[in-house]
Amino acid sequence: MQREPALDPQKLAAIRAPFDRLGGARIEASVLQPLSLLIDLAGESLRARLFVVQADGAEEMALRPDFTIPVVETHIASHAVSGLYRYEGAAFLLAEPGSDQPSEFLQIGAERFGVSDDPLDDDAALAALAFEAASAGGRQDLELRLGDPALFAGFVAALGVAPPTAARLVRAFRSQRALHQELTPDRQPAAASEGSDLSDILAKMSEKDAARLLGEVWRLSGVQPVGGRTAEDIIHRLALRAEAARAPNLTAGQSDLLRRFLQLSDRPGRVLDAIAGLAKEAGAELDLLLDTWAKRLAKLEARLAPQWGGVHLATAFVRPFGYYDGMVFDVESRALGPDLPVAAGGRYDALVSRLGGQPGAVGCMVRPGRAILGLRP
C-alpha cells in the first residue's frame, strides 16, 4: 500500500490550527467499518476502492475511506442533540489504476451536528474553515468550487416532471453515465431482469405481505439489516424504484432545459441568474430556492471576501460520497486539478436521520499531503 511521504511538522501544525481554534471535542474514530453499511450509505461505486477484511465467520469490514460515517456513529452513540467534533488520522482508499496517488493518507477535519438557528451560516463557516486550513500549506492557487444536489432536485421538480421520473433523475444525478441516459427523450425502460429473483417476487406483492416475507427470509438466514432499516423501509424503497422504472420519460423540452442547467459553471451570482432565466423560460417557480442560495452566498462572501474571485458554482458538481444532500464544496488547486481536491465537505442532513440521529449535519476535511506546497500529492 502506497503511503504519503512524511509531512513537515510546522506546516502540518499550521493546517491543524484553524480546526483547533474552532474547538469542539477531539475524537478517535474506528478504523474498521462494516462494508455493507459503507456501501449502503456512500454508494455501490465506492466498493472497488475499499480495503476489505474479514475474519472467519465474521461480517466483511473495510478500512475507513473517510471519517464522516464513523464520526456520525460516535455522535449518535453519545445521545447528544448537537455536537462539534474534530478528528485527525489516516483514511484508506485504493488509488485509481495507473495513478501514483497514495492509498493511505492523512485527513484533518470537523463535523457539526444538530438543528442550527442559522444553517446557512454553518455551511459558510465550514467552507471558510476548509479554505483557511488548506491555504495554510502554502499554496497560492486555491479556488472554491460549490455545488448542491438540492438545486438539481428543485429544478427538476419545478419543471413539473412526474414524481417517479423526478426520483429517478435525482438518483441518477451522481453518475454522469446514468444521467446522460435519463436525459435521452427516447430512453428505454430498465429491463425487468435487472432485479434479483427475490426483488421481482417482492415487487409483485403488497407492501405489507412483502415486508412479512422479507422479515422471514432474514430470520431464517440469520441476516441483520444495515443502517437501521426495517423490512418495511426496504420494501417501500423497492416499490418506489419499481414505480420509477415504469414512469414516463422526459419530454424533449424538459430534457433540453435540464441539459442547459447542468452546463452552468461560473461565478456564483451569474449561475443563479442563469438558473432564474431557465426557470422563467420554463414558466417554473424557483424563487425560494434561489433566494436561499443568494443568502448563503452572502454569508460565504463575508467570510471569504479576499478570495471571492476564486469561488465558482457548478450545477453538475457532486461529491463522490452519495450521502451529501445539501451544499457541497471542494477546495481545488489549479496545479493539481479538480480530481485532486485539497479540501472538501458539505451538508448531509439525511445521513444522520438514516442512522437514527437528529437531522442537521455539515462537515469538512483537509488533505495535508495535497495542501503542502512542493510536496508531491
Q: Which residues does each predicted region cover?
A:
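Beta-rich nucleic-acid/ligand-interaction surfaces
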Residues: 29-48, 147-157, 317-326
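Internal, well-ordered domain-core segments that constitute the primary functional module
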Residues: 107-181
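An N-terminal, globular interaction/scaffold subdomain
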Residues: 41-60, 68-80
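Positively charged, Gly/Ser-enriched RNA/tRNA-binding surfaces
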Residues: 4-34, 66-79, 83-139, 195-377
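Acidic, His- and aromatic-enriched active-site or binding-groove loops in soluble protein domains
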Residues: 47-57, 160-194
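Short acidic, glycine/serine/threonine-rich loops at helix termini
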Residues: 39, 98-100, 155-159, 376
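RNA-interacting cores
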Residues: 78, 85-87, 142, 146-151, ...
